[in-house]
Structures are given as C-alpha cells and as structure tokens.
C-alpha cells in the first residue's frame, strides 16, 4: 500500500512539473510571438539588411532536447530568456528554447529578432560570414560569437587582427579559442589504440611487391599549402601511389570513387596496406589538424605529415609520425622513408605505441577528456551545441553580475584564435615552376584580405549600416 501511495505521489509530482514547464514554454512562445508578429520596416536599412523584410514571420514551435529544469532560486519570469540569434542559416532552427546546465536561452536564425530587447548575442559561422549583411548598429549589450572550424581558404579576412577582434567569443581549431575544436576529427583514444584495421608488418612487406611505400589521396588540388607541388617533387625520388584527383596515377575501385566513401571500410582496407601515408593539410595553421593525420594513425599506417607547425603537441607519441618540416628537401625525406622501408626494426618504432595501446601525450589525453562535446557520439553534445551553450552561459554570467550591481565581464578574441601565416610556395628547382594557382590566387587573396579586414573594421566601428559599394571603395582606396 505504501509503495502504491509513493507511486501515486511521484506521478502527481511529475505531472505538476510537466504542467509548470508547459506553462512557462507557452508564455515564452506567446511573448516572443507578439514581438515576431511585428515586421520590421526601417527605411534606413541598406543592402545588407534589406533582406530582413523577407524573413519568415511564423514561429517555430519551441522544443527542448533535454528537458528544461529551472533553478527556483533564479525565479525566472517567462520573458527572461536571452535570445541567441544565429546570423547564419547553419542550424536551420527558427526557434528553440535550449537548456545549458542551469541556464536556458532561446536560439533562432530568424533575423526579425535583430532589434528585440532580449537579443544578447549574435552567432556567426565563419564560412558564410559576409560583409553583405551584418547586425548593425551594434549595441553595447550585443556580443558577437564566431564558430569557425575550417581552414582559412574559406574566409581569409577572419584571420586578421582587425576582424577576429570584433568577436567576443570563439570556437575555432585553435587551442587558444574559448571553445577549442582542435580534436574535432578525433572520436577518442579508443580509435587510436584500436588494432581493427592494422595490417601486420610481415603482410605489408609482402604487399610492397605491388604497392608503393607511400600513398597519397587528395581531390582538393592546389590548396594554399601547395601540397601538390611538394608531392610532385617527392615523386621524382620515391614511388607514390596517388588515388585522388590530384596527381592521380592509380584508380580506386568504382564503388569507392565517391567522396562519401572516404570513411568506408573498403577504403580503409586499401590505405591500411601501405606503410606510409602522405598526410598533407590544405593550409598551414597552428592547431589546424584534420582527418589527414588521424586517419593513418587509426589505421596503423605511419603519417608523413605537413601542416600545423604545432603538430608535435598533439601526436599520441613522440615517435608516431614523420614530420616533413624536419627535412630540408623532398630528396632527404625520400631517403629517410626508403631507409625505414628496408629496416623493420626502425619502422616498427613508429607503430610501437599503437601495438602497446599506449598514448603518452598528456596534452592530447587531457583535451579529449575535458572537451565538452563529442564526435559521432549520440550520447554527447556536438560541437555546435557546445558552442551555443558556451555563449548562453557567458551571457547569463554577465546578467548575474549586473543583477548584483557589478559591471559585466568583457571577452574579446585575439589573433591566436585563428593563427595562419601568409601562404608560401615550394620552388625546388628552375625546372619546376611555382604553381600558378598559388601565385595567382592564394597569395594575392591573402594580401587583399588584409585590406578587406581593415576596411570592414573601420565600417563596423563606425557602427552604421553600410553598402557593399562603400566597403569595396574603402578596400581599394589606396
């Protein structure tokens, strides 16, 4: 009888909690709906904001993926939720009340919230960050947050001091970011120590009769890192099997020709047969590390790495990769690889960490353990969720400070949050000219992006809407 009474009491409590949550959510929907029903008609809006007239005016039903539990001590009113406005269609969500620990914020891509009094932060996605449309004038309580996990080739102007310092919060590949995404392509330690795809060295030696010691798979040709020029020169000193669109000399099976198959077991089996993989990033930036590195380490193949200058800080072991930067010329690199190819003991030293399942790099272990998001893990938030919650929490922290009569804490990004030098080119001999794509596109693009960054900063600091004509006139003023 006591158990039945307890069960009824528990059910009653749950019903009450659910009712309270629904009432709060309904109030928020009604209040925001009243605001959203008012269409902006500002004659002062210029090119970038004219498109707001076409924004949808219906409200997406609120939902909360984890269930909203409010702290009673906060005594939050229904209209107290800060609005986080995505200045990008990235999430596709026109309205969502999301919980971030004990805090809650309203996330939306609907730009009709631009002038709402509860809009506290604007969230930008770096790849589609554009001068054509910015939320200006920027009010004192408007925070700007940048999510940019990709290389500089997607938007060079972000990588210069005048622009990156416009943002209060960042989530980038840099360890110095407020939400570092350095390990965004690595699921965890288990995939590094797994022997699932490992091909024994004896078998690899046998396969060498028909395979080159090195394999190269790239279909994004002539990127800012100029990797194809290096590999082309390397090919004159050692055999390289190239399966991608770039420098291809060996075809993939038809069923693996689709780029979507790059994570297929069949593709992994092909790569795992090789002793070495050329792991060259498309850009050279501190902490910019992609699947180019992690894939060979997962497969038990030694990566020959070119990319992040800080890569040694992230390798699982002191001897787990060959770094191109340690060789003065592809000729020296080829000689070293041939020596390892002939000497099983020296080669084995590069995969010893994997065979023993030992990751000695404490920085890597700590980063994986402490990150607040997961990779392909339904039990964890993804990094976009984590970014949203980071901004939401920081906004709430400042709200609480102001409620105590204290000034809000000001955050600002700096150039270490996206650290990429100007692209350079490889020119190994007069017979191998510099790649036209770099000379005629990437380097001038980087140089012009400096002017664009200065012009954009001046216009944003003016804190008025501006046209694309104004922007480009300022860029080419000198």
Curated annotation (Swiss-Prot):
Transmembrane segments: 10-30
Highest taxon above the source species: Eukaryota
Record keywords, A-Z: Disulfide bond, Endoplasmic reticulum, Glycoprotein, Glycosyltransferase, Membrane, Signal-anchor, Transferase, Transmembrane, Transmembrane helix
UniProt entry tagged with the keyword Repeat: no
Recorded metabolic or biological pathway in which this protein acts: Protein modification; protein glycosylation
InterPro entries: Alpha-1_3-FUT_met, Glyco_tran_10_C, Glyco_tran_10_N, Glyco_trans_10, GT10-like_C_sf
Disulfide bonds: 389-392
Keyword Endoplasmic reticulum: yes
Main location as per UniProt: endoplasmic reticulum
Lumenal side: 31-478
Catalytic activity: L-threonyl-[protein] + GDP-beta-L-fucose = 3-O-(alpha-L-fucosyl)-L-threonyl-[protein] + GDP + H(+); L-seryl-[protein] + GDP-beta-L-fucose = 3-O-(alpha-L-fucosyl)-L-seryl-[protein] + GDP + H(+)
GO MF, any single term: alpha-(1->3)-fucosyltransferase activity
GO cellular component labels: endoplasmic reticulum; endoplasmic reticulum membrane; Golgi membrane
Residues exposed to the Cytoplasmic side: 1-9
UniProt subcellular location: Endoplasmic reticulum membrane
EC numbers: 2.4.1.221, 2.4.1.-
Glycan attachment sites: 110, 168
GO terms of biological process kind: fucosylation; N-glycan fucosylation; positive regulation of protein secretion
Membrane topology: Single-pass type II membrane protein
EC class name: transferase
Stated family: Belongs to the glycosyltransferase 10 family.
Function per UniProt: Protein O-fucosyltransferase that specifically catalyzes O-fucosylation of serine or threonine residues in EMI domains of target proteins, such as MMRN1, MMRN2 and EMID1. Attaches fucose through an O-glycosidic linkage. O-fucosylation of EMI domain-containing proteins may be required for facilitating protein folding and secretion. May also show alpha-(1,3)-fucosyltransferase activity toward the innermost N-acetyl glucosamine (GlcNAc) residue in biantennary N-glycan acceptors. However, this was tested with a library of synthetic substrates and this activity is unsure in vivo.
PANTHER family: ALPHA- 1,3 -FUCOSYLTRANSFERASE, ALPHA-(1,3)-FUCOSYLTRANSFERASE 10
The name this protein goes by in its record: GDP-fucose protein O-fucosyltransferase 3
Record organism: Bos taurus (Bovine)
């Amino acid at each position: 009888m006591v158990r039945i009474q307890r069960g009824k009491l528990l059910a009653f409590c749950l019903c009450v909690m659910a009712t309270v949550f629904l009432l709060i959510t309904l109030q928020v929907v009604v209040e925001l709906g009243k605001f959203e029903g008012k269409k902006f008609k500002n004659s002062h809006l210029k090119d970038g904001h004219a498109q707001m007239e076409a924004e949808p005016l219906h409200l997406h039903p609120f939902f909360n993926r984890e269930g909203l539990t409010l702290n009673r001590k906060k005594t939050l009113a229904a209209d107290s939720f800060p609005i986080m406005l995505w200045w990008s269609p990235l999430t596709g969500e026109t309205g969502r009340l999301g919980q971030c620990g004990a805090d809650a914020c309203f996330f939306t891509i609907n730009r009709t919230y631009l002038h709402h009094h509860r809009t506290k932060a604007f969230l930008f996605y770096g790849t589609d960050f554009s001068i054509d449309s910015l939320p200006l004038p920027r009010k004192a309580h408007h925070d700007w947050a940048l999510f940019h996990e990709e290389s500089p080739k997607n938007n060079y102007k972000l990588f210069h001091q005048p622009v990156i310092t416009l943002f209060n919060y960042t989530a980038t590949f840099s360890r110095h970011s407020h939400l570092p995404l350095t390990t965004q392509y690595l699921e965890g330690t288990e995939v590094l120590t797994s022997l699932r795809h490992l091909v024994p060295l004896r078998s690899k030696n046998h396969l060498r009769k028909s395979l080159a010691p090195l394999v190269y798979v790239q279909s994004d040709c002539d990127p800012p890192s100029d990797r194809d020029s290096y590999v082309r020169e390397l090919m004159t000193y050692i055999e390289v099997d190239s399966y991608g669109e770039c420098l291809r000399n060996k075809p993939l099976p038809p069923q693996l020709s689709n780029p979507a198959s790059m994570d297929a077991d069949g593709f992994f089996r092909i790569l795992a047969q090789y002793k070495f993989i050329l792991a060259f990033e498309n850009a050279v930036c501190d902490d910019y590390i992609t699947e180019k590195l992690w894939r060979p380490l997962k497969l038990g193949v030694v990566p020959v790495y070119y990319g992040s200058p800080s890569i040694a800080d992230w390798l699982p072991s002191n001897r787990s990769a060959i770094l191109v930067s340690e060789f003065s010329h592809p000729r020296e690199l080829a000689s070293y690889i041939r020596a390892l190819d002939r000497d099983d003991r020296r080669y084995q030293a590069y995969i010893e960490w994997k065979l023993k399942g030992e990751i000695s790099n404490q920085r890597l272990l700590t980063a994986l353990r402490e990150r607040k998001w997961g990779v392909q893990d339904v039990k964890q938030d993804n990094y976009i969720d984590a970014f949203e919650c980071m901004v939401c929490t920081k906004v709430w922290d400042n709200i609480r400070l102001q409620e105590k009569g204290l000034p809000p804490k000001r955050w600002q990004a700096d150039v270490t949050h996206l650290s990429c030098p100007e692209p350079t080119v490889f020119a190994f001999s007069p017979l191998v000219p510099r790649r036209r794509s770099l000379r005629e596109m990437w380097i001038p693009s980087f140089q012009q992006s400096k002017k664009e960054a200065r012009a954009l900063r001046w216009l944003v600091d003016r804190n008025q809407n501006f046209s694309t004509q104004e922007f480009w006139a300022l860029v080419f003023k000198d």
